[in-house]
UniProtKB/Swiss-Prot annotation:
Broad class of enzyme this protein falls into: transferase
Chain intervals for the UniProt region annotation (Disordered): 1391-1412
Keywords, sorted A to Z: DNA-directed RNA polymerase, Magnesium, Metal-binding, Nucleotidyltransferase, Transcription, Transferase, Zinc
Residues binding Zn(2+) 2, per UniProt: C819, C893, C900, C903
Catalytic activity, reaction form: RNA(n) + a ribonucleoside 5'-triphosphate = RNA(n+1) + diphosphate
Any one biological process term the GO annotation gives: DNA-templated transcription
SMART domains: RPOLA_N (SM00663)
Provenance organism: Paraburkholderia phytofirmans (strain DSM 17436 / LMG 22146 / PsJN) (Burkholderia phytofirmans)
Protein name: DNA-directed RNA polymerase subunit beta'
Amino acid sequence: MKALLDLFKQVQQPEVFDAIKIGLASPDKIRSWSFGEVKKPETINYRTFKPERDGLFCAKIFGPIKDYECLCGKYKRLKHRGVICEKCGVEVTLAKVRRERMGHIELASPVAHIWFLKSLPSRLGMVLDMTLRDIERVLYFEAYVVIDPGMTPLKARQIMTEEDYYNKVEEYGDEFRAEMGAEGVRELLRAINIDEQVEMLRTELKNTGSEAKIKKYAKRLKVLEAFQRSGIKPDWMVLEVLPVLPPELRPLVPLDGGRFATSDLNDLYRRVINRNNRLKRLLELKAPEIIVRNEKRMLQEAVDSLLDNGRRGKAMTGANKRPLKSLADMIKGKGGRFRQNLLGKRVDYSGRSVIVVGPTLKLHQCGLPKLMALELFKPFIFNKLEVMGVATTIKAAKKEVENQTPVVWDILEEVIREHPVMLNRAPTLHRLGIQAFEPVLIEGKAIQLHPLVCAAFNADFDGDQMAVHVPLSLEAQMEARTLMLASNNVLFPANGDPSIVPSQDIVLGLYYATREAVNAKGEGLTFTGVSEALRAYENKEVELASRVNVRITEMVHNEDKSEGAPAFVPKITLYPTTVGRAILSEILPPGLPFSVLNKPLKKKEISRLINTAFRKCGLRETVIFADQLMQSGFRLATRAGISICVDDMLVPPQKETIVGDAAKKVKEYDRQYMSGLVTSQERYNNVVDIWSATSEAVGKAMMEQLSTEPVTDRDGNETRQESFNSIYMMADSGARGSAVQIRQLAGMRGLMAKPDGSIIETPITANFREGLNVLQYFISTHGARKGLADTALKTANSGYLTRRLVDVTQDLVVVEDDCGTSNGVAMKALVEGGEVVEALRDRILGRVTVADVVNPESQETLYETGTLLDEDAVEEIERLGIDEVRVRTPLTCETRYGLCAACYGRDLGRGSSVNVGEAVGVIAAQSIGEPGTQLTMRTFHIGGAASRAAVASSVEAKSNGTVRFTATMRYVTNAKGEQIVISRSGEAMITDDHGRERERHKVPYGATLLQLDGAQIKAGTQLATWDPMTRPIITEWGGTVKFENVEEGVTVAKQIDDVTGLSTLVVIDVKRRGSQASKTVRPQVKLLDANGEEVKIPNTEHSVQIGFQVGALITVKDGQQVQVGEVLARIPVESQKTRDITGGLPRVAELFEARSPKDAGILAEVTGTTSFGKDTKGKQRLVITDLDGNQHEFLIAKEKQVLVHDGQVVNKGEMIVDGPADPHDILRLQGIEALSRYIVDEVQDVYRLQGVKINDKHIEVIVRQMLRRVQITDNGDTRFIPGEQVERSDMLDENDRMIAEDKRPATYENVLLGITKASLSTDSFISAASFQETTRVLTEAAIMGKRDDLRGLKENVIVGRLIPAGTGLAFHKARKSKELSDRERFDQIAAEESFEFGTPETPAAEQQHSGE
């Protein structure tokens, strides 16, 4: 009976586990896995097709070929289950055991595992403390290694050649032992006492001072400690037994024509077995040493190529001269196991087809072709047919469906009712790339898609295809319906803007209907209601754009809040409006006033309208409203009948004169160039400037002509109104085209770019209406081709960036409501060059406050700590003019494994506070990666006219208010009474009456201040001016000039100006100075007071000395009296070199990879006073003396611009040498907040240039992940090593444990890792291995005996569990708490009833261990 029941075993419950451990297998372990030794290299008998006994496919070892049937056919069928046939030795069981039973090969000589030998850094080398080169020579039989020196002067692990060996043998006889090959290496590994070595290394580390040694010891210690902790023996890195993969995983498939297709692994195994057998035979025959050695070496090579072909020497090739695919190749790379089969699987119940537009659908519907639905929902239909009794068996049901009988269609309708399907369009760049819809059955073979979701899918109907997936289980349907239904996803998760905005024709229709025309038919009429206006319109008494008065009923919020009172009450008002707007007022959702429609609706307006509707009226109303807007838009666009004709492109009459004038100016520049007045570069720049201005002028003239038209109003007066020109309306509404494109149609095409990005100086003066000639046509195609090639590259690069971002953040999930931190960042409006780039309201919307927000006027608390700021709150804050709010940020969140909801704030895609379980990491990565393809690939050349801003020489206030200086602003007053700035990083702010910052400007060193702190000014007032062409050196003290080392012809040269005849002294470049002595000195000035004493810097013993750098023009004479603030020398600023600015995608990648820029600027390490030390060859030495008198030196290349001078006080983290900032320095010297501000601002700059909106918090989430490792500075009593990098959470856990045990915790500093490094250094080895460098990751993990706790999303997808995010997080939490409570109950019962359990150890403990 039992056997019968076993037969009908239920589906096995999958094993529940919480972690996966990886390690090295000992030889015994390998033997225990095995079902027998593979002795022969044969695979199958070519005549009978049966596997050869003891061969690679042997049925005795691996199991039967057919279910429940032994090889010779003696035992067949189920009743002999589990019998082992005495004739052929095969167990009668399922054939699928051939997928899981392993074999083994007993190697005649041990073999080193190539991963531990060659994967850098070599683990074998680390453990043995030998170089890789030496170990290789021993392993491949080129040298001997001393195992046991005995009483000889030789050292253990010493390498000797064959010659040496024989000499030493003669000398010492058998006093010592030396070996060759893997046996020798294995002996050495066995001899190592790990505990002893670890102790020794730890003491060495404490006592040594040399950097190199510390590094070396720390590395070795790490490996040895890993062995110590994991209990893995180092000699297991040398294989004695080789496991053999189950045969079904390396199949041999007969092709027609008697040939076979085989997996490469079979070839590789065959070679190993052949060589192994040959070696066994040679050993038995006692063959000469040299032959045996050669065979051993070949065996080692064969095993190497089986494990990782091509890692050492030439790859083994098959018959077709291709390298064979080894075990390592099977798992790594895009086509390997991880990325091909574990992370991306093909799924059943899916189909794909072309999409077409479905304008009649509701937002939550999609049209599904009947035939597709029939196929996708087959099992559901079979079930229904059986239940209804139409068919008795599945087979009969199948027939019904195949014949497509009428009853089947009725059942299909029933089955798909309220059963959502998921639509996906590749590439799925963000979560809106997969949405759920309710299917509506349609004829035809194309899927119908709702026009409003196209923006989210980035779909158009030029042949795009989409895939359909059917959620099967009830839970899946629930989730699809509640979380993924298109009508529940109306906001972009990247920035919280509506994703269901109308575009194209819909916009055109709505725009046309809401425009107003002067003196249209029926102007001035008054209508009692919308229906009357509509009737008049249909009878052609009025036009859509006629200005009329209409009584309009609005639904407004009810003031009466009592029980049972309706939420909205009607309010009737007579509005002056147009007929079209009145008709649209019918679809307004309750709660929105008519005023939102009473204006021409352009694309931006419509987007704002939908946003307002969502915030004021909620999701449901918005969706209905958007749907109705779409219907109206399409209908009205059809009625409008807007089309394009050539006559709509009006070419401005003044074009010819404008172009003619420009050509004259260009000729003039050519003439100047010919006569040598300007350089070729200047001429080019000027010509390009002229043409771009001309192009603008023609465009402006054209737009003026296009945008208005003359009309006669009702009183007969001539007036102009906005034009009803079709092309203008299309561009103005935002439906199609833009001003730039219209300029090409009817203005002039303008300047074109070459493929290298430089600008061709001859413009295309024609436009498309006039037509281009051949040269013009060629010029325009020239740069355009580069654009197309760029696009292809861009897509790949952008995809790779997204992949890296997802990988670094995939384990970041919101796991709790509040971590209780009191840290945050101060948010201010983002100001650049005096312009507000991003208002404060946009930056704090949806964030949680970390300090009370106080009303600046009444000092009362408006919003307490912990308030989530919504739209109303930020508007109030803006109204009150609060200019800084401290908010929570993901960067400072103290949750260990994940984030808390308070630090994250609002979930932008839902418009409410973020839910626990939201995978915010992946959302952040997608939000940054998704617009990647819109970013440019090119680097900008500054120097062309394309982006050459005129050099600023002053700052002007843009608003009225009070001038305020920052704390870093320092200035002196000179003899003329002017204020001269002497600080490098001073900024001037303009604040309004409430003290809110309105704008801020950097004021450079040497500028003259025209307004002082506290001055009341009007907009347009100049704050400061300076000479843009030179950088002055200014004295802060008065006195008599005394030159030092200023010798004409030695350190300075006299320069005479050709035009003016004046002479000045110039400091000569070090390289051009003659004598050796003059190379080291530095020309400088000291100041003497009235008594001839050197002027001292106040409060110090240092005398004032002001150095002149190379190239400075000295403007004072020796012995001259100077006043405070006077200029001693000027340094000409090199005319803006045409440096490339990295822009676009490469810049974003550079920031996230945390790469140090090439010539990074140098930041001051400490706060203190600067002075210059002795210069070395080509370098100048800058010394900062800190407040305690310690000196810190910097060596700076001579050609760099030093931003400080002698005696200047600098703050820690201030830039002292010009250059791009290095993010690592910012983190080290200014802290996490400054770093995050730097990265966020820089990344946002790139996206803002392309007009892409991304919320700051997404970038902050990535930065948090880049900071997730820390470097241990002092290890205290912890298990860490100084200088080691560890996970922050790991370190905090360890420190908590130390504090609990009253031991010393470790101290640490933050480290910034690029996203690739951060992904690879994650705690989860499964996730890291599936990302990049699979071999290295797995090697490292195996030695450390790493345990993967399956915390992230990726690892869980790979092992096939529910991901710990969203509903999966709740599932895992519930499962764990149930396990806990079960265990507690068990312990309780065990305590109460004292009977003996069958097993000595309690199952509770077992349960704990089974999770490993």
